[in-house]
Amino acid sequence: MGQRAVLIIAENEKYEIYYDHWCANTLDSYLFWGPEEAVSFIRKHDPKKGYWLNDVWCEGAVLVDLDKKKLLFFGGEDITYEIPLRRVYLELLAEMWKGYEIKWAYHGITDLARYAGYDWKSLMDKSKREECEII
């Protein structure tokens, strides 16, 4: 059981990876209040160098790039499945994250890995690798 999430902070062109076993379904609530609150929440976790979950186990993830002022994420039980609610949430999030480019990670953890320069294909479940190619 769990709602596994990968939490990443990019700063000074380096990536710090953190892990939370229980926050994927509520990740949206931790991000809502802006970058300071989000970064504080992420840094309360122990760093997990090189700890990437694959696309089967990762149920939510966030990457906050403090240098480029970008937020890339997916997760949150309601906004993941209710698209109209997600649209409203993202509009509200833009007000709380002034100056940041906010993006939904439509391909899950592989979008974050790709952004960070990590081998995103290694995070795909082997049974899926042969069936599709993410372009």
Predicted regions and their residues:
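A short catalytic or substrate-binding loop motif that flags glycine-/basic-rich loops and adjacent residues
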Residues: 1-2
